[in-house]
Regions:
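Bacterial Sec-dependent N-terminal signal peptides
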Residues: 1-25
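Acidic, metal/ion-coordinating pockets
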Residues: 21-320, 360-372, 382
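Catalytic centers of hydrolytic enzymes
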Residues: 22-30, 34, 39-49, 53-68, ...
Length: 588
């Protein structure tokens, strides 16, 4: 009997153990995110003509290594802003538009599992992004990118803009994952309606709430991820939406396990407690594929249900990874064609120009753009900001690559009607972001922020440098001893005529600014957002770089010089202060 009892006990124990093994298991998943690639596919800077660190060709080496470790348990996602940046995407978008889009081919080659649309994927215009959407093979996500007539409607996949999906579904080792993609709804503040005709952009918190509910009811997933082309917080905030709403969604919309995000070109890897007291990982790799964002998820599953989730977020630097030579060989013809394109000769400069000089007063770089804007539009006044932190165009032959350094974005060129007072207030708003109020000769002249030196859009300043507008066509002084809102004194028109704050002027600017970008026209000049369209006198049908290029071609030889139409005062204080700030920013 004892022997039988022992045998029976052993058999029962073995049966229970086998059942436990069958009903309980651990699954490990890995997710890798890229974001704000901006055409940084290959390890070559087509603008500067030199090697690049990072880029997708290096990231792909790391990704393939992780795929070998993880097998099918790896999810690769991209967070948008891929269609504008390096000249290779401009070449694909506009020079050879009949061919399959290069960005689509790169996404397909790397076998991404999902992609969210970014604002710089909308800016190239319907012809470009509609074709790109058709050519990308993985799900393209945009839960808040809806057909015009469907804004703020129910959660219905039929309401989403043609070719996009609100979310994607992925099964990994029996685990069901849903990825919700959203785009910052601030597009109308930057882009003319013609660029996004037929589309509306919903506020993110409300949109996330309805789609989480829909997914929980219809998909019953084990994990819900966000893939948001929207920064952590801040930016443009209106009564209708917040530009950077990732933190708000993480806090206010229960259901998310992880939110992968981007748009703000900053590294983030942190936890946020939502309104139910649960922790949500939010993670952002920043831009240009210097890093990837990685999440490792270990799930304990019992009886087919997830009973525990361990999540770890990591920012992985890929700047010095080995280049994926197979990927390079696959795209070598494209690389050679882009090099030939950017090598085209446009004209000749008799002297070099430097963007860095734009932060300290009149500069030949910024004033060349001002002068060309006035030539093209015949406006009275030009407004523009430095679009690069530290670029140089050397004297001698000017190539197409130099034109991308001169003007980095595919903005259109606009002319608006503005009163003299609005012009002054616009400039006040700009210089308030740009400069400090000095109370002693030892103060900073510029509004600097040590914490932003690694931020690719602030680069050591407190505010975005692409909002530092100066003006041409008027002579003025900026007094750094005056308080905000009282620094700018306009002396006269540059042609010698009086400047009148009550008079209407024709003012040239780019499309980003003309549509309210940076809020200089709205918060600064005081023009209501819904009145901006009525102020438009003229706009180009092609990007500004195209017209700047054509003007330089016509001129042949250009001798760029500062206009000397404005300056910082009092000079006894600001000159030494600017030199100190120059050393802090540039080291010399």
């Amino acid at each position: 009997m004892r022997r039988v009892f022992l045998s029976t006990f052993f058999a029962a124990t073995l049966t229970l153990s086998v059942q436990a093994q069958q009903t309980s298991k651990t699954v490990t998943l890995k997710v890798i995110e890229t974001s704000d690639v901006h055409g940084h596919f290959f390890p070559w800077d087509f603008m500067e003509g030199r090697p690049l660190k990072g880029t997708l060709t290096r990231a792909n080496t790391y990704i393939n290594r992780e795929r070998q470790k993880c097998g099918d348990n790896l999810l690769l996602i991209d967070n948008g802003d891929i269609l504008q940046g390096q000249p290779c995407v401009y070449w694909s978008n506009y020079v050879i538009p009949e061919d399959e889009n290069l960005a689509a081919r790169v996404i397909n080659y790397m076998q991404y599992d999902a992609e969210t649309v970014g604002n710089h994927d909308i800016e190239p215009g319907h012809k470009v992004y509609d074709k790109w959407i058709r050519e990308v093979r993985c799900p393209l996500l945009g839960a808040n990118i809806v057909k015009e007539e469907c804004k703020d409607g129910e959660a219905d996949p039929e309401n989403i803009y043609t070719g996009l999906q609100p979310y994607s579904v992925h099964i990994k080792d029996g685990v069901k994952i849903c990825v919700i993609g959203m785009l910052t709804p601030a597009i109308p503040n930057w882009l003319n309606k013609s660029i996004w005709k037929g589309i509306e952009f919903e506020e993110m918190v409300g949109c996330a709430r309805k789609w989480v509910k829909y997914i929980q009811e219809n998909e019953q997933p084990d994990l819900i991820f966000g893939l948001f082309h929207s920064g952590k917080d801040g930016g443009i905030v209106t009564t209708d939406y917040e530009e950077n709403a990732t933190a708000a969604v993480a806090r206010e919309v229960p259901g998310f396990d992880i939110i992968f995000f981007g748009h703000d070109h900053q590294v983030h890897n942190e936890w946020i407690t939502n309104i139910e007291g649960k922790q949500v990982l939010i993670i952002d790799p920043s831009c240009w594929v210097r890093n990837v964002a990685e999440a490792e998820i270990e799930l304990t599953i019992q009886d087919g249900k997830v009973v525990n989730k361990d999540i770890k977020g990591t920012i992985v630097n890929v700047e010095d990874e080995q280049i994926d030579e197979q990927m390079m060989a696959h795209f070598q013809k494209d690389i050679d064609a882009v090099k030939a394109y950017v090598g085209q000769k446009i004209g000749r400069f008799e002297s070099p120009i430097y963007t860095r000089e734009s932060f300290f007063g009149n500069s030949a770089f910024t004033d060349l753009i001002h002068n060309l804007q006035l030539q093209i539009t015949h406006a009275d006044i030009s407004l523009t900001a430095p679009l690069a932190f530290n670029s140089t165009i050397k004297e001698g032959e000017v190539t197409m690559a130099d034109m991308f350094k001169l003007y980095r974005f595919e903005n259109l060129l606009f002319t608006l009607r503005m009163t003299g007072e609005e012009v002054r207030k616009h400039l006040e708003y700009s210089y308030d972001m740009w400069t400090n109020t000095m109370t002693s000769p030892d103060d900073h002249a510029l509004r600097l922020n040590d914490d932003s030196k690694d931020d690719q859009q602030r680069t050591g300043f407190q505010y975005y440098t692409f909002n530092f507008d100066s003006a041409c066509g008027i002579d003025y002084e900026v007094d750094l001893t005056k308080p905000d809102g009282q620094k700018v004194k306009i002396l006269r028109m540059s042609n010698g005529e009086p400047f009148d704050e009550k008079k209407w002027y024709k003012v040239a600017m780019n499309s980003y600014r003309a549509n309210g970008g940076g809020e200089l026209l709205t918060q600064g000049a005081g023009i209501p957002k819904d009145s901006l369209d009525a102020r438009v006198i003229f706009h180009t049908d092609r990007d500004q770089r195209h017209f700047l290029t054509e003007e330089i071609r016509k001129m042949g030889t250009v001798n760029p010089k500062p206009n000397h139409n404005w300056k910082f005062v009092p000079e006894a204080w600001v000159k030494p202060a600017l030199e100190r700030d120059r050393k802090l920013l540039f080291g010399n």
